[in-house]
Each structure stands twice: as structure tokens, then as C-alpha cells.
Amino acid sequence: RCILEDDYDSEFRFVGRPIPTLFSTDESQRVIYLNTFSKTIAPSIRISYMLLPPRLLERYREKLGFYACTVSSFEQYTLAEFIRQGRYEQHLSRMKNRYRQRRDAVIRLIGESRLGERARIMEQDAGLHFLVRLVTALPDGELQRRAAARGLRLAMLSDYDSRPSAGRAHILVVNYAGMDLSRLPEALERLAQVLDEEELPCTTN
């Protein structure tokens, strides 16, 4: 058995040193490393990569040597040259600065809004999203329904959990990468209004 390490969003770490990958510390050759350029360059590039431990490399070549990549050779060679010339690292540095500024702006706007006193920011040091724990007794489904009635679409952490638990309730997932910051204050006010009306009867349990 092997561990599949999907190092998604690892390039965007804003606090502290990069965390070593499991693959880099694996001495038993049981970790397969996966990553993609879709977030760091563009989703349309559709180029990902996989690092295999030596003991699996020959098996891969034997069993899957016939596999044909769907990405054109031209795009692969262009990306390879981009990396070889050091342009990728320069690009990544610019993107990290841009997203750090965007993240800081979103956190600041949340703190300045009426929602601020009922929201606790979590997991904001890496990736292009963070979590916000809301102070509310509303079930997540009811919170989402009431928000939808005000034109808001909320992504809750419990939506991604196959076994929802109380410890993961009331946690909002905020993806700020493509967020329109000019509309955020109004959205935060609408969400604050939803929490203001918490005492209204729930439509579901």
C-alpha cells in the first residue's frame, strides 16, 4: 500500500517556511507525490505531474508505458523552458505577493464589518482559501437556505465532510482567489443580517 500525497495549493504558503512534503521524508518508498500547475499558472493549462518512488517507476513503465498524455508536446516543452529559465519561480513570487495582499484585504473587510464580532478566522496562513467559524446556532443547511434567500451562496466545511460532526459545523469556507472585493462589504452585511434573524423558526431541523 502507498500514500497518495496531493500537494494542492502548497506553493501558496504565506507564513513560516515551506512544510516538507511526505515524499521528501519518505524512506520506505511508499509515497506517491501529485501536484498541478492549474492554480499557479492557469486552470486551462491542465498540466499536472506525479513523482513515483524508484521501486514503482519500473512497474509504471511496464504497465502504463502505453499511456499517451492529452497535453500537447508544445505546451509541455514551453512550460519546461519556463521553469528552466527561472521564470516560474519569479512568477510564483509575484502571485504569492498578490494573493497575500488579497487575503489580507478580505480579512480586514471581515473584521471591519458587523460580521466581525461573530466570526473567527481560521487556517489563513496557506492556500487560496481560509475558514471562518461563525457564532450561530443555525444548522448549516438552514444557514445556507437563509443566505440564498438574500442572494448569497455559502460553502460550508460540512459540505465536504462525508460524516458531518458538530465540531465542523458553522464553519464557512472562503475562497478569495477570484473574489470581487468591491462587492464583499455588501455580502458581509447580508450575512450579518441572516445572523441577526437567527431567532426566526428554522424550516428544517
Roles of regions detected by a PLM:
Residues 52, 131-137, 154-194:
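Conserved PLP-binding active-site segment of the aspartate aminotransferase-like
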Residues 61-64, 85-107:
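Structural signature of PLP-dependent enzymes
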Residues 80, 97-107, 119-133, 143-146:
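Conserved glycine-rich beta-strand-loop-beta hairpin in the small C-terminal domain of fold type I
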Residues 1-15:
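Catalytic PLP-binding core of fold-type I/II PLP enzymes
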Residues 24-59:
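Active-site PLP attachment segment
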Residues 56-75:
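Active-site C-terminal subdomain of aminotransferase-like
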Residues 21, 61, 79, 110-111:
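Catalytic cores of nucleotide-enabled group-transfer and carboxylate-activating enzymes in metabolic
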